[in-house]
Structure formats: C-alpha cells, structure tokens
C-alpha cells in the first residue's frame, strides 16, 4: 500500500513496461476507484524545428459539398440530393476502387445516364448508394457534388526518433470546407524553403510562405497517419542524417512547469532552426481539446520582430524546457499573435 497526498504529484517506479490497474482506497480502507496506469519507457527524441512541405492523398474521394446545376431542359438538377453529403468518402464506383477525382469524373461523364453504385464511407460506416447522373447544359453527365482528393501545405516537423519516425504539426489536417479530419490513403513530406513572412497582427494571423517543388527528388519522407495529435510517418535516411541536434528526454505533463521555455523554429531560407524564448502561461492537463494543453506567450524580441509572434506554418515547432522536449506549438490567438497554444509531447506520442 502506498500513502498518497492528493495535493502533490505522485510518481510510481514500476519494474516492467506494461499496463497496470491500481486500486485507490480512502484512508487505506474504503475502496474509492480503480486507476489504469500505462508505464512507458524513457524515450529520447531529436527536436527538429524544420519546415516541411506536406502532401496527402485522401482515402477515396472526399465530398465537400452537394449542389444543383442547370440541365439540358433548363431545369435545376440535383442527382445527389439526400444521397451524398459533405464529409462522405466515395471509395468505389460499381465495385471498382477509385484512384483519384479525375478517374471519378470520367466515370460519371461516361455513364450515359445509367445508375452508378457508389460505395460510401460516412462516419466510419461503409455502405452503397445508387445515384443517376444527369446532363448539364453542355450535355455532360454530372452528379452535382464538389469533391477533393488531396491537400497540401507547409508546416514544421516536431521530432525525429531513433528509427527515423517523425511527428509534425501537433494537430491533424482538416478539410478546409467540411472542417473534418481528412482520411489519409498516403502522403509525402517534401523539402521546402521559407521565402516570405507575413507578420501577425491582432485579428489577422501571420503566415510563413514556403515554396514546395513536388518533384520526386525533393520527397524526403512518407506520411502514414493523420490524427488529431499531428501527422506521423518515416523520414528518409538521407534527410534524417541532416537533422542536427542532440536527442532529448521526453518531458511528461507532470514535469512541465509554468515559466520560461523555448521553441525551435526555422524562419530563414536555407537557414538552421533557432531557439526562441517563450513563457508558459498556463497548463491544462485534462483539456477537452488536447491541442490546447499548453498556453504560451512569445517573449523573444527577435521572434516578435520577425513574425509578430506565432504565425501559420509554425505549427509543430517543438517546445523545450529544462533540457527536455515537452510539446509542440499548435495554434495562435487571433486577437493576440504573441500568444498561442501547444500540445503536450506525450499526447503526440499517444497517436
């Protein structure tokens, strides 16, 4: 039996790395509750802080909106109404898996108005719907839906582990129209160069502008997971060898303190990541939104001069404190670009 003071953090030394269930009793007698304990190995990660170009391909074709169009008879046509909705993923047409939206639009155009059986994934449920394409004023068969099959952008790599696994962004990639987390079939990281910085001001977030050349030789890694905690995958050995820096211990939530910390970020074309001073203003260990567990404020005059604070594209910049990697930058306050949020690194690692 271990006596516990609820006013102080508790650390338990375990002999093995595994899951445990602990019985909690009041006064050592009255059963109070059971607590699941996950014992993790002391992990070390290399803080990256480098900008990366991101390209992801969706699992199927994402429906971002349903609409009507004018038909040959000048009446409004809505073939997909009540059948498809924003957020649906079209996986197959007549049993044939889709490779991309070009293939899908070609199949619809070639349907000659015959029924198509679409295999749909909606909220994790897979089912079939039957829809009949109709002609627009130019005689082309349409379904009246807006679709997307990929997303691109610029972000920051957070860390690299000993097996060349990386984590980046600190939050998931959501569709700009539906706001839903995008289902990823595959994805890639590319080299990128920061060519411009738009400073943030109150009411208007700033932005890092990067140039991405999607040539094969510029591909530096594969993205396998897009989750609320960030994007994750494997970096090429060549690129991993270029990531400079010492592997640091992972700082768990209970080790993070309010006060001074640093973020590692790259703001210059062909420049190396630099450390910038911040202050941790508040900690939310059990925040409903795990991407907002750490509340930060930029205090480094160099960073304030360059960016005005936190800007888009800095998401994923690792947060360091007391020689440990403790989190990653995720969001900026719209009304105060010097302030923002971060995710605890242990939450990123739980993906």
Predicted regions and their residues:
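Beta-strand-enriched, solvent-exposed domains that form extended recognition/catalytic surfaces
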Residues: 1-31, 37
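PDZ domains, with a preference for the canonical peptide-binding region formed by the helix
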Residues: 4-17, 92-125, 336-338, 343-347
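Envelope-exposed proteins and targeting segments
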Residues: 20-22, 33, 50-52, 57-61, ...
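PDZ-domain C-terminal substructure recognizer with occasional recognition of PDZ-binding tails
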Residues: 25-42, 105-144
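Signal peptide-directed extracytoplasmic domains
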Residues: 43-77, 121, 128-134
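A short glycine-leucine-enriched loop at secondary-structure breakpoints
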Residues: 75-89, 110, 308-313
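Conserved PDZ fold ligand-binding element
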Residues: 79-102, 319-322, 326-331
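Serine endopeptidase catalytic core focused on the charge-relay Asp
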Residues: 134-308, 312, 321-322, 330, ...
């Amino acid at each position: 039996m271990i006596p516990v003071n609820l006013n102080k953090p508790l650390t338990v030394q375990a002999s093995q790395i595994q899951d445990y269930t602990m019985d909690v009793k009041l006064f050592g007698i009255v059963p109070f509750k059971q607590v699941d304990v996950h014992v993790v190995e002391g992990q070390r990660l290399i803080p990256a802080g480098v900008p990366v170009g991101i390209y992801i391909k969706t699992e199927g074709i994402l429906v971002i909106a349903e609409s009507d169009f004018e038909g040959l008879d000048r009446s409004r046509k809505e073939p997909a109404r009540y059948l498809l909705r924003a957020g649906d993923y079209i996986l197959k047409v007549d049993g044939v898996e889709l490779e991309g939206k070009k293939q899908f639009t070609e199949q619809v155009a070639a349907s000659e108005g015959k029924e198509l059986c679409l295999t749909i994934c909606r909220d994790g449920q897979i089912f079939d719907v039957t829809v009949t394409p109709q002609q627009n004023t130019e005689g082309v068969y349409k379904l009246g839906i807006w679709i997307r099959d990929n997303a691109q952008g610029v972000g920051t790599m957070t860390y690299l582990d000993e097996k060349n696994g990386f984590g980046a962004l600190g939050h998931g990639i959501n569709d700009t129209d539906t706001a839903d987390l995008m289902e990823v079939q595959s994805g890639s990281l590319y080299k990128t160069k920061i060519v411009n910085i738009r400073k943030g001001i109150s009411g208007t977030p700033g932005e890092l502008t990067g140039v991405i050349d999607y040539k094969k030789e510029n591909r530096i890694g594969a993205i396998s997971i897009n989750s609320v905690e960030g994007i994750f995958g494997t970096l090429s050995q060549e690129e991993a060898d270029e990531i400079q820096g010492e592997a640091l211990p992972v700082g768990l939530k209970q080790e993070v303190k309010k006060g001074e910390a640093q973020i590692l970020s790259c703001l210059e074309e062909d420049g190396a990541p630099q450390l910038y001073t911040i202050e941790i203003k508040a900690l939310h260990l059990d925040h409903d939104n795990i991407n907002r567990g750490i509340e930060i404020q930029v205090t480094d005059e160099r960073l304030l001069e360059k960016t005005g604070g936190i800007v888009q594209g800095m998401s994923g910049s690792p947060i360091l404190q007391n020689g440990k990697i403790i989190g990653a930058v995720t969001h900026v306050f719209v009304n105060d670009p010097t302030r923002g949020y971060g995710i605890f690194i242990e939450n990123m690692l739980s993906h």
